[in-house]
Amino acid sequence: MDIRQTPRFALLFIAALAAGSALAAEDINRVNGAITAHAGSEYGRLETVNGSITLDDGARSGDASTVNGAIRAGNDIASGGLSTVNGGIHAGERARIGGSVETVNGSVFIGRDGEVEGDVETVNGAIGLVATVVAGDVGTSSGNVTIGAGSHVRGRLHVDKPSANWMPIRISTRRQRIIIGPGAVVDGPLEFEREVTLYVHDSARVGEISGATPVPYSTPTAPPRASD
């Protein structure tokens, strides 16, 4: 290398470092207002109090949390945990979630080929998984649960008795429907502290069941509610 070019290379190296620093993941933290994580950008933590959070298709972020607002994640996202208090959480296909997915008042849906490294839990709301792997537990107090075709829950599935110590819980007079779909697997126990109607597909595999009597089925979908 011509030594006369050394200063030029040094300047280029410093410029590259500066550019890398500018592109480093940044946190977004606000009290009021929605947050959107755009595809092609790297984000740190996403936090708001009053507002929704959106992760566009292909977006990358750390944990995303809000108090009053929904969380909507597109296809092929990668994030930390997703949590809200008042709002649902919806993730598209092939989501990679490096933590738990949790809400209090709202439903949770994880699309096909998703991966969740933590738990999937809500208090008032339904849970739906499609060909999704959950490393932890799946649980709710008041809501239907569908462990859809090809899903794999490595922890337990639990439906808890509502607690008077928490926020008011909407209690339906209808039994909750718990569906374990074709080819689905729940490694841990299935524990029910409330009356539920539990459907388990003939091709599914589940752990020990307590608090409910499973109803086997062999059709692509569970029997309609009219037969509950």
Language model features by range: what are they?
Residues 1-228:
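Intrinsically disordered, low-complexity terminal regions
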